[in-house]
Structures are given as structure tokens and as C-alpha cells.
């Protein structure tokens, strides 16, 4: 595999991807970031088995391939590189060589086949709302999520689409928070409970800009 990207694009995608890298795990492969250049896009994937993140990185693919690299080591290398073009090349021994100007790093990788891939999402009719709106709805309800994990449902938020409204509900046994917004078109009724940890990370990723939109493709895997 050989890909060429600008440092700024790599760093942006790695920063987002790190939010789905577990701090502790019995599966070392989950500490990795999957770099997939087997198609016409460069994709970074991380997965802690609760939250999975896939980002598309702007760049050029000169040789197709796939590799899993330790996410934190990869981040530290990219962070310290000069603000210029970065080349990532792998060999048959799964060794990755990262070069930028006069800087050169070599780190061992793992087979992409061992990685915990994200589930294939069956795309329903996508719900499109502004990133600002979703970020605000999460912010105004997440404080009522229970911290006690004896009741898993209370550690998440209910997302429900019904009667042309999106409703988000959280409760911890003592208080309840509800936020509703009218949708601009009709959608089929559906609902799902999303873990609070996942929503916290999603909220950090959302830009908070009114003009930026987010497409919710499925309320099974949100």
C-alpha cells in the first residue's frame, strides 16, 4: 500500500478516529486504526465494540492495500510531522514507513483481516438535520442520563421518530429531559436507545454549525 495525504487531512481524521479507540481492552487489534486503501477512497476505521467510526481521508492512492496500525503511536507520529505532504507505505511484512520532508518513521502493523469491522448498515430513509441542532439536542438532554450501569437503558437516550417529530428522551430515575423538533418531511415511525458514551463522542465530533448537516442513515445503527 502507498498513499499520499496532507498532514492536516491525516491529523483531522486521526483525531476523530481516536474517539473510538478503547483505553483498555483484551483485544489488542482494537487499539489499532485500520487504514483501508483497497478501493478508490482512503478510509480510517476504529471500533471499541460500542462506538465505531469511519472517516474518509483526502489523498492519493498510488498502491492499494490495507493495514492496522497502533492508533496512539500513529497519532503521535502524524502530530509531530511538518505541515506538508505525508507518504505512508507498507511492505509484505506489514511494516509501515511514514515519511514527510526529512522525517521518516517505521512502525509494525497488523493484518487488516483481524480488525473488527463495522456492521453493514442497511440504509433506511435518511434523516437530515443540522449538526448544530443535533449537538444542541444532545447537550440539552444528556445531563439526565444515569451513571449507574445497573439499568443499561437509563445510561442512554431514547431517539424516537413519531408523527413527524424527532424526540430525544433521557432519565436517571430522578429527573427526565425531553427535547422535540418538528421534521420537515414525513418519516416512518422508529426508535432506538443510544448509549450516553456514544452520544458524548458524537457531540464532540459535530461541528455545531447550522449550515453543516448530518445524515442519520439508520436508527438501528445510529
List the predicted regions and their residue ranges:
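Structural preference for solvent-exposed beta-strand-turn elements
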Residues: 1-220
